[in-house]
């Protein structure tokens, strides 16, 4: 089973039959339209390419326009690809959120919020040094970052200050709380990466 591309709407909460509050993320999944079907003979692997949403005509490049016309679908806001195994799809086919009706858990992939250049305390959860006791300048610095003349260098991968966020993140095995096919919504328990209105990829959980 392939995944779908959706849009993170935001978080809210719902109550179950016992009155327990469940924090959920609302993901809007409009129809994913098939723009290309890749085969073993032509492409060396099997996959399906989809688009969703819409894009201003003035923003669609000529190569993109030709690609969408060939598939017979409206230009979408992007192109995404999912590997397939024995599943059959046709150009222009629409895949909707109801494919998750019988799915218990999903993996959600998105781009985390960018936080710019951050220090070790925020980026890696380092503890801070003493506020007093003679420490006047090094409250939030890392401390030692190496050894001595041997090895005479800082090891690769050393946790230091640097760019935080704005990277591809996958949260695994989120429980599917509700599938609302009429309103094109999927509610999953917990948080998912990314800002409001950002694109997310939802797939059946690998570890379910």
Swiss-Prot record:
Single annotated GO MF: rRNA binding
Protein's GO biological process: translation
Family annotation (PROSITE patterns): RIBOSOMAL_L3
InterPro entries membership: Ribosomal_uL3 (IPR000597), Ribosomal_uL3_bac/org-type (IPR019927), Ribosomal_uL3_CS (IPR019926), Transl_B-barrel_sf (IPR009000)
Secretion signal, residue range per the UniProt entry: none
Keywords (A to Z) from UniProt: Methylation, Ribonucleoprotein, Ribosomal protein, RNA-binding, rRNA-binding
Entry-annotated residues carrying N5-methylglutamine: 149
Modification(s) after translation: Methylated by PrmB.
GO cellular component: cytosolic large ribosomal subunit
Pfam families: Ribosomal_L3
Function: One of the primary rRNA binding proteins, it binds directly near the 3'-end of the 23S rRNA, where it nucleates assembly of the 50S subunit.
Family: Belongs to the universal ribosomal protein uL3 family.
NCBIfam families to which the protein is assigned, alphabetical: L3_bact (TIGR03625)
Quaternary context: Part of the 50S ribosomal subunit. Forms a cluster with proteins L14 and L19.
HAMAP family, per the entry: Ribosomal_uL3_B (MF_01325_B)
Protein name from the UniProt record: Large ribosomal subunit protein uL3
Taxonomic source organism: Glaesserella parasuis serovar 5 (strain SH0165)
């Amino acid at each position: 089973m392939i995944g779908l591309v959706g849009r993170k709407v935001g978080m809210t909460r719902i109550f179950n039959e016992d009155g327990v509050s469940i924090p959920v993320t609302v993901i809007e999944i409009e129809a994913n339209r098939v723009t290309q079907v890749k085969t073993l003979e032509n492409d060396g692997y099997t996959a399906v390419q989809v688009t969703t949403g819409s894009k201003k005509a003035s923003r669609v490049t000529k190569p993109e326009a030709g690609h969408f016309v060939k598939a017979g679908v409206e230009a979408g806001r992007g192109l995404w690809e999912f590997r397939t195994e024995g599943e059959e799809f046709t150009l222009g086919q629409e895949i909707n959120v109801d494919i998750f009706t019988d799915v218990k858990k999903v993996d959600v992939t998105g781009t985390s919020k960018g936080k710019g250049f951050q220090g070790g305390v925020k980026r890696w959860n380092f503890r801070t040094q003493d506020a007093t006791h003679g420490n006047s300048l090094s409250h939030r610095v890392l401390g030692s970052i190496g050894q001595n003349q041997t090895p005479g260098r800082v090891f690769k991968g050393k946790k230091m200050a640097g760019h935080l966020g704005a990277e591809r993140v996958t949260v695994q095995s989120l429980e599917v709380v509700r599938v609302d096919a009429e309103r094109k919504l999927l509610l999953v328990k917990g948080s998912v990466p990314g800002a409001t209105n950002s694109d997310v990829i939802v797939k059946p959980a690998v570890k379910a």
